[in-house]
């Protein structure tokens, strides 16, 4: 059940990324106003324009999509902050090397969950995404609402993107109907660590290619 929920949430995140752009070429997030909602729009525009360019060259293969994902999506996610949330109280028990091991595992998990979906998308015209100008900001974190809808349909869904700011605003989670990707990751890691112990989990992650 958790895997189904996680896949559903990541699909929503993915759809938001893929269909948010209105025009290409995009403007770099570094060149626009430093507010959460404008940064979200600029981030998504940059990503989607890159995928449009990829598909215009008829190069939407799994390999090319994977490379573009690593280059254009992952850099906009604050993996360290996401991993800290996913590990909750376990985070403070880890040294710097062990934290990087879990960060790498989370990155791999996110890529594996949506890369095949990214590679299979061919129809770019039927989904609209609206980024709300209003946002909630608290110190160095923010929440921005996205509304997704189908063309020629009254159906829509709203999701909340969560961002954290260090040197720039980056995504760290997505929430839909009070369920978030990182809360599901937290449940998964907590269950695994309680069964195996944190040292064994780290050892197993180190053995992964």
Language-model regions, residue ranges each:
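Surface-exposed, charged secondary-structure patches
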Residues: 104, 112-158, 208-209
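Short beta-strand edge/turn micro-motifs at domain boundaries
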Residues: 156-184
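Alpha-helical propensity feature that highlights long, continuous alpha-helices across diverse contexts
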Residues: 21-30, 50-54, 124-125, 129-139
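Solvent-exposed loop/turn segments at secondary-structure junctions
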Residues: 91, 108-109, 150, 178-181
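Surface-exposed aromatic
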Residues: 99, 144, 171
């Amino acid at each position: 059940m958790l895997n189904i929920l996680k896949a559903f949430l990541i699909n929503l995140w993915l759809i938001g990324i893929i269909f948010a752009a209105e025009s290409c070429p995009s403007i770099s997030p570094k060149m626009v106003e430093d507010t959460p909602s404008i940064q979200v729009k600029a981030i998504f525009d940059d990503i989607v324009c890159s995928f449009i360019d990829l598909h215009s060259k008829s190069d939407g293969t799994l390999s090319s999509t994977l490379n573009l994902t690593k280059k254009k999506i992952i850099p906009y996610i604050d993996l360290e902050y996401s991993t800290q949330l996913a590990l909750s109280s376990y985070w403070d028990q880890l040294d710097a090397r062990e934290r990087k091991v879990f960060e790498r595992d989370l990155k791999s998990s996110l890529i594996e969950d949506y890369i095949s979906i990214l590679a299979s998308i061919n129809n770019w015209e039927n989904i609209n995404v609206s980024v709300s100008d209003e946002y909630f900001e608290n110190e160095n974190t923010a929440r921005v609402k996205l509304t997704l809808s189908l063309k020629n349909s009254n159906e829509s869904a709203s999701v909340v993107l969560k961002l954290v700011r260090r040197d720039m605003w980056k995504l760290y989670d997505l929430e839909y109907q009070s369920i978030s990707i990182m809360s599901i990751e937290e449940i998964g890691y907590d269950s695994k660590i309680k069964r195996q112990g944190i040292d064994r989990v780290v050892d197993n992650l180190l053995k992964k290619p």
